[in-house]
Amino acid sequence: MRVYLTLFLIIISSINFFAQELNYNIEENISYYPTNESGLTAYQKAQCRLDIYWPTQKKEVPVIIWFHGGGLTGGSKEIPQALKDKGYCIVGVGYRLSPQVKAATSIDDATAAIAWVFKNITRYNGNSKSIFVSGHSAGGYLALMSVMDKSRLKSYDIDANKVAGLIPFSGHTITHFTIREERGIPGEQPIIDKFAPLYYVRKDAPPTLLITGDRELEMLGRYEENAYFFRMMKVAGQEKIEHYEMQGYGHNMTSPAFPLLIDFIEKFKE
């Protein structure tokens, strides 16, 4: 589905003005692994932290967990400016990176962070029944993997279907290229295995909004991956899934995508 600037402006204008009048707090560098847990490395303690930005005067607000991009080799936790002052509780997550660890470890960290949010976010006025998981590029991949593979959150006694929605921005749906490169597989050689969101397509997945750049401008066939994921989810019976293609934008398509994320949250929040 191709989206134009006029649609973005309509969505932006529909945001509740009252949200901009709220006061917000931010708490940084919260460890989402127990700091007294034996076996944690110094690198894990340093990287596996999150920041929370939340409105102080309003309770049970929707929660957005945001995973940064960087190919699973770079980047750092962030709270996107475009999501601030909208009345939401925003969680920016850091995670371990390759080559310090195997890239798949990033998925373990992302899952642990989501579990922490489920169990603690009410302390920050967040609604644990309205948790949305998002991120750009590698962050979109982590969002998908952590939720589509139900066994991951199940290890924390959390049903992945309790996630209110998935909104990956230009995320891999095949096995991530960094994981493939660690195995000696070229980045342009696609595979689908247990490290691919496509491996876990299912009817009962949370509502999902896939957003990619223009098919002629995106990197590494990212549009086509998401289009295939969309189709296979439909084949599996999932009706609450959409795919938007940002015409005229490449991989760095976050700016026009954020209004779509906000509109999606307003549609599916508790």
Each language-model region and where it sits:
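Bacterial Sec-dependent N-terminal signal peptides
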Residues: 1-22
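N-terminal cap/lid segment of alpha/beta-hydrolase-fold proteins
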Residues: 20-58
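Short beta-strand element of the alpha/beta-hydrolase
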Residues: 60-69
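Short amphipathic alpha-helix adjacent to the substrate-entry channel of hydrolases
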Residues: 76-93
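Alpha/beta-hydrolase active-site loop
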Residues: 101-122
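Primarily recognizes the serine-hydrolase "nucleophile elbow" in alpha/beta-hydrolase
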Residues: 115-181, 192-193
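The feature captures the conserved acid-bearing segment of alpha/beta-hydrolase catalytic domains
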Residues: 157-165, 171-177, 188-227, 231, ...
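C-terminal catalytic histidine-bearing segment of alpha/beta-hydrolase fold enzymes
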Residues: 211, 227, 234-270
